[in-house]
């Protein structure tokens, strides 16, 4: 199929026709259900994180107080205000306060280096910035921020009141009528936010998203995923960086759907936060869920139950695959029942014990991971979208789940496969433009109504979309063979020891790979085998190479011989946002890795 359109339906909800701004949602929430717990605010404690309830009425009052401060500070309608923080309650509070004041939010990853930060602040012409810590404030100043001319507030300010308290005090003289004029003057077609893309290969581009983009995209998404919000006590825990479009959509969707929302600032604290927050569903990128499974595997190994966990994992995957075939044999059924009681129930408890579904986006989900989660009773609903499409374009649904695909287009959305295999998208959620970048806008939106996504994929006869890679990730070997690097990398990363993988081979005689290991998984693996010393002393260890070879073999089994990884090198390093090899959404910065590991790549072709 070359094109598939999901027709708009009345079920897409009233949000698709909203005329005002996103701050209206908070006002309506407080008017309709003032005492409902809209948020649970994280507070660290000696025995783990605690949570304090924030009602819809309290949240609205706080939003108004901060919005008054922004107005008093001279922030005008349409002005850009930058937010730079980890994931926390105050981000959502500030986001809505900025919209209530008629301004535009510009999210910045807390890990953004100075050069990228300078670009975003200058390109957006932000008039004010709110950062989490004094250290981030220093980074903003280092980027060239004109301190005396533009406001800079710090949430956790050691030398004075934090940003929220300072803005609240500043806005005491702003009356209700003036504040309400700001909110009610916002129209759906006004700009809500400028989100800068991760910039895996070049300067980040600012995606201009309107209030209408969010209203219409979320109207369709919430209607399609209504089963997630059916529980009266539906709740979810935000694990994504708030600068990610997916996170912004989650926060907005939680308010629209009356879902209790919590925030966790660090994936390393996620297990403890899940245990105390106990969400009914989760949303995140695949790497988050891979880490949760790896943590469960390591815990089982430390308790002497590693082999049982591995056997249960294979049972879960086979169970899910059997569901796809429509036939579960009696032996598999009995084994699944046993492993569910002994192992899977414990994994579900690691998710908080109440989690019924997981929604994954932002990066490709490996099929093994998808089958594993469905096999343990917590299906992953994989979707697809971009910053340019206000997140979701397609999504799998609980009753029409097809693992290995990203689902069907949302109502009112069309997906087309171009002649060169690129996926094109049309719908009300597509961005207006790239901020102050006519050339890039014309390339992405050439005037025919279709957004060029840069992704390559296919559509089956029932409208399910499969993303096979990025156009820029297609390698062409000297024999002329096209290789989808991303798909191979994803399958190598399925191995619990592997953290990251970069497939190379463009203009080369064969395909090869650089592999890094998960530090925690490697530490457990090495301890079990009595290996001492740093990883750098063991990268050529026969047993370790055999493990990585198994990961490579599993990936190679899915492609032709000409596309298979022929050689690999295990690196002693860990790639991260901090060291620059990964974006904040945990995607590879290919140009950075190629530049830093040029010698290692050359060794693969010696």
Give the ranges of each region predicted by the language model.
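ANL superfamily adenylate-forming
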Residues: 43-48, 52, 137-188, 296-344
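Conserved pre-ATP/AMP-binding loop-to-beta segment of ANL
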Residues: 34-37, 172-196, 203, 229-235
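Conserved AMP-binding/adenylation subdomain of ANL enzymes
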Residues: 215-235, 242-344, 354
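Structural core segment of the AMP-binding/adenylate-forming
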Residues: 72-73, 100-170, 547
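Conserved AMP-binding/adenylate-forming core of the ANL superfamily
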Residues: 35-96, 113-118, 168-171, 211-212
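Conserved AMP-binding A3 loop
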Residues: 53-57, 192-218
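Conserved ATP-dependent adenylate/AMP-binding module captured primarily in the ANL superfamily
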Residues: 79, 110-142, 217-237, 267-281, ...
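Conserved ATP-binding/catalytic segment of the ANL
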Residues: 409-477, 494
């Amino acid at each position: 199929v070359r094109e598939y359109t999901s027709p708009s339906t009345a079920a897409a909800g009233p949000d698709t026709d909203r005329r005002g701004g996103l701050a209206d949602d908070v006002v309506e929430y407080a008017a309709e259900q003032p005492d409902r717990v809209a948020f649970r605010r994280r507070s660290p404690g000696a025995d783990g994180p605690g949570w304090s309830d924030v009602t819809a009425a309290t949240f609205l009052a706080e939003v108004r107080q901060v919005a008054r401060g922004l107005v008093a500070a001279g922030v005008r309608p349409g002005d850009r205000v930058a937010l730079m923080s980890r994931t926390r309650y105050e981000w959502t509070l500030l986001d809505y306060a900025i919209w209530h004041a008629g301004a535009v939010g510009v999210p910045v990853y807390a890990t953004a280096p100075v050069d990228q930060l300078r670009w975003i602040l200058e390109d957006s012409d932000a008039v004010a910035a709110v950062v989490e810590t004094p250290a981030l404030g220093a980074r903003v100043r280092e980027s060239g921020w004109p301190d005396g001319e533009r406001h800079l507030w710090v949430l956790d300010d050691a030398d004075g009141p934090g940003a929220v308290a300072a803005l609240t005090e500043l806005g005491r003289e702003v009356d209700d009528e003036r504040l309400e004029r700001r909110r009610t003057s916002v129209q759906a077609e006004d700009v809500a936010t400028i989100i800068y893309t991760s910039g895996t290969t070049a300067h980040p581009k600012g995606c201009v998203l309107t209030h209408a983009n969010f209203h219409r995209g979320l109207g369709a998404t919430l209607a399609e995923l209504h089963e997630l919000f059916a529980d009266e006590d539906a709740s979810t825990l935000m694990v994504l960086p708030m600068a990610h479009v997916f996170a912004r959509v989650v926060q907005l969707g939680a308010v629209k759907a009356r879902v209790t929302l919590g925030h966790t600032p660090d994936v390393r604290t996620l297990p403890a936060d899940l245990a105390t927050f106990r969400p009914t569903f989760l949303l995140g990128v695949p790497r988050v869920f891979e880490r949760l499974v790896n943590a469960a595997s390591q815990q089982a190994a430390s308790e002497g139950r590693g082999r049982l966990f591995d056997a249960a994992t294979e049972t879960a995957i086979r169970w899910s695959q059997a569901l796809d075939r429509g036939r579960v044999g009696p032996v598999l059924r009995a084994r699944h029942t046993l492993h569910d009681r002994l192992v899977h129930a414990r994994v579900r408890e690691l998710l908080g014990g109440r989690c019924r579904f997981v929604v994954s986006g932002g990066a490709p989900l490996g099929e093994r991971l998808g089958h594993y989660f469905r096999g343990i009773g917590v299906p992953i609903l994989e979707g697809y979208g971009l910053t340019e499409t206000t997140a979701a374009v397609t999504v799998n649904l609980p009753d029409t789940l097809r693992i290995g695909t990203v689902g069907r287009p949302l109502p009112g959305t069309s997906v087309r496969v171009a002649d060169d295999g690129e996926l094109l998208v049309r719908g009300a959620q597509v961005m207006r433009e790239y901020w102050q970048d006519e050339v890039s806008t014309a390339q992405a939106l050439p005037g025919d109504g279709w957004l060029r996504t840069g992704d390559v994929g296919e559509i089956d006869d029932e409208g399910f979309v499969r993303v096979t890679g990025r156009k820029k990730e297609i390698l062409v070997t000297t024999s002329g063979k096209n290789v989808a690097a991303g798909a191979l990398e994803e399958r190598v990363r399925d191995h619990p020891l592997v953290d990251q993988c970069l497939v190379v081979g463009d203009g080369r005689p064969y395909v090869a790979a650089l592999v890094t290991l998960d530090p925690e998984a490697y530490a457990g693996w090495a301890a079990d085998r009595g290996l001492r010393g740093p990883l750098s002393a063991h990268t050529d260890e026969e047993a370790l190479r055999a493990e990585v070879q198994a990961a490579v073999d599993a990936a190679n089994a899915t492609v032709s011989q000409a596309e298979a990884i022929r050689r690999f090198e295990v690196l002693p390093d860990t790639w991260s946002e901090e060291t620059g090899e990964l974006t904040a959404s945990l995607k590879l910065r290919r140009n950075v890795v190629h530049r830093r590991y040029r010698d290692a790549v050359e060794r693969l072709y010696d």
